[in-house]
Amino acid sequence: MEILVCVKQVPDTAEVKIDPVKHTVIRAGVPNIFNPFDQNALEAALALKDADKDVKITLLSMGPDQAKDVLREGLAMGADDAYLLSDRKLGGSDTLATGYALAQAIKKLAADKGIEQFDIILCGKQAIDGDTAQVGPQIACELGIPQITYARDIKVEGDKVTVQQENEEGYIVTEAQFPVLITAVKDLNEPRFPTIRGTMKAKRREIPNLDAAAVAADDAQIGLSGSPTKVRKIFTPPQRSGGLVLKVEDDNEQAIVDQVMEKLVAQKII
């Protein structure tokens, strides 16, 4: 079984600050981390590899050269190969352009392996820096394969996957044949830590770079020219004011109801 996992290096959102004038993210001095949902996606692939040693896991990331840090972390966790899609032409890509570029890279990697498609492509449900949850589904659309999003449990039998797909009311069970793209939620698993031995081996690994030409990407569909999305402003949500606490003596239920009704009438809610 051939599995590809898309991973991304993201700024630690706990440290991110917004420029109050430009309304852009201030990245200087902000540490970068392995996108948490992508770690869940990788752990799902590693669990399948634990159960079947014939499983091969390929990692793919798109970004600057420093994104190789998360690829090496993924190799240290147990992935077999890793590739970085990096090109100045990709700068400014929105989710549409990113999905297209990654799909082009996936096609090339599959062809290089002598296969038509990867059996399973795994992505985190979203990246914590953009929170769009669009790139995974966009890749599936570009490749013309089924997609199952928000996976909280994955079972593989033969060339079929059965997935518990998380939703607001609980979950639904969805089945699909290979090839399929699946996006992972946090409840899917608990990602393992890289081993010391794996970390040392990963440091010595050469991670190949792929540019736009290598994956036959159309310049009109990548970067700013291929990105119809225009970001007008980035901002932090305003802090909520504290809730109103109503107090009465002797657990007088009628007094509580009267106070609540008085407040609702005063605010013209009723």
From Swiss-Prot:
Domain of life: Bacteria
InterPro entries: ETF_a/b_N (IPR014730), ETF_b (IPR012255), ETF_beta_N (IPR033948), Rossmann-like_a/b/a_fold (IPR014729)
CDD domains for the chain: ETF_beta
SMART domains: ETF
GO terms, molecular function: electron transfer activity
Cofactor(s) needed: FAD
Cofactor note (record): Binds 2 FAD per dimer.
The protein's assembly and partners: Heterodimer of an alpha and a beta subunit.
Role according to the record: The electron transfer flavoprotein serves as a specific electron acceptor for other dehydrogenases. It transfers the electrons to the main respiratory chain via ETF-ubiquinone oxidoreductase (ETF dehydrogenase).
Protein name, entry field: Electron transfer flavoprotein subunit beta
Gene: etfB
